[in-house]
Amino acid sequence: MAEAAPARDPETDKHTEDQSPSTPLPQPAAEKNSYLYSTEITLWTVVAAIQALEKKVDSCLTRLLTLEGRTGTAEKKLADCEKTAVEFGNQLEGKWAVLGTLLQEYGLLQRRLENVENLLRNRNFWILRLPPGSKGEAPKVPVTFDDVAVYFSELEWGKLEDWQKELYKHVMRGNYETLVSLDYAISKPDILTRIERGEEPCLDRWGQEKGNEVEVGRPRMMGTGLPPYPEHLTSPLSPAQEELKEGQAPKQQQDSEARVAPAGPEAGGGVAIKTEAQSEDEMTPERLFLGVSRGQTECRIPRGPRNRPGGPSRHQAQGMPRVRAGEPRPPGASGETPRVLSRRRQRAFPCPDCGQSFRLKINLTIHQRTHVEEGRQEAPGRSPTSCGDSQAMLEPGEVVVPGPVIRWLPEEPEGRRSVAGGRALVGRRPAASKMYHCSECLRFFQQRKSLLLHQRLHTGNGQGWPACPYCGKAFRRPSDLFRHQRIHTGERPYQCPQCGRTFNRNHHLAVHMQTHARGQVGPHFPAAPARHGSLPLPWPSRKEEG
């Protein structure tokens, strides 16, 4: 059931009915203000959103412009690359054409070289004889392989060590390659052929090359199949020489004039060549190893006729020697033949033991090893130096080690000069009687302090060297450290007595004083100091520091 409605007061109801239709209720102000505020907030939010959108549009527009610029740059680079590719293609075509031309020229040059090698192998050529100069000077004769080659006998080759043999082979190959690079038309020597085949490049006991059968009594030239000294050249004196001998010509005239020998019937197509007899100091390897006597002369005998008619070749084919004006002609000589000047061999490295001269120092070093081995074989139980003398000269902690034998040439009289090389070879014995040996690099020194200074090189990173306390830089000598420290301290102990200027080194002061000496020479200072010892030396000198 519905609840009963509360009872109303009749007076209250009546009062309410009277007021409601005549007076309406007013709207509150708070609700109006809140509505206006919310509307304003909504408007500002819309404005902010519009501004953010405008910023995004501007950013997108900027990026679009940047992309357009980069696209244009890429297009330009692409166009440049296309141009470069076209130019490179054109250059490549030109280089290919040049390369083809070079290949053709190389083929022609190779064929020419093959033809020259065939001529050299067949020995179907004449040796070039250069005429003398306008002033009578000797012509420049091309270098041959025998001029720079050294040959060893079988005994000497057996005494060499393996590394010395390899060094010898390397030097011989280098000499041949050098001559070929200088455009000398020479064939490959037999010694290089044996080296390539793995054979020993030495001579047998008779002075002949191994693997070649020639007459024992007549040694032949290296690299040729002909005997170097024909019978008509090694024969006794010719009639021209006999006449000079009977006339008792001066010795100088006999030495200056060459020997002339007539062409015998055995010469064939050869030519008698006038040469000068070499002295004992100018002995060549052919004489030393092949056992040629001093009375024989060396020459080259061409074989085969010349292609050019007439001229000097016509006389040479007849075997007629050339003689000087005023000399008696040999029998059967008519006309003149070209003159061949002998080439003097300059060998500036003589051996002090046997007198043999060498053109290269390495050949002398290898040759001296043979003397050392011979000395050891002759006296195997005897050392080169006396043990008692060497032990008596040793200091505590030092030992004598075996090293290379240092040989000194004997004293020569004043004014005498060696023939080989044109230089004086006056030997001087060392001041020190023993050598100091470095165990690291096998070097020898005459003074102990030199060995101590040298051993600092093997310590590494400047260990054991005096170092600067300011910058830590290490020096080999204490005197160098003292001079270096003056850079940090600013000390200038050397003062000029003329102008008062100071220097940190003695020789700087000496150079400075020479400037004053050019203008005037005062009584208080020398014009030019003769030596550093004339000036005050507050610091120890190089000799005192050791």
UniProtKB/Swiss-Prot annotation:
Say if the entry is tagged with keyword Transcription. Answer: yes
Protein's cellular compartments: Nucleus
- Record's SUPFAM superfamilies? beta-beta-alpha zinc fingers, KRAB domain (Kruppel-associated box)
Q: Which residues form a coiled coil?
A: 48-124
Q: Where is the sequence biased in composition, kind Basic and acidic residues?
A: 1-18, 242-258
Alphabetized UniProt keyword annotations: Acetylation, Coiled coil, DNA-binding, Metal-binding, Nucleus, Repeat, Transcription, Transcription regulation, Zinc, Zinc-finger
Return one GO MF term: DNA-binding transcription factor activity
Spell out the protein name for this chain.
Zinc finger protein 783
Species of provenance: Homo sapiens
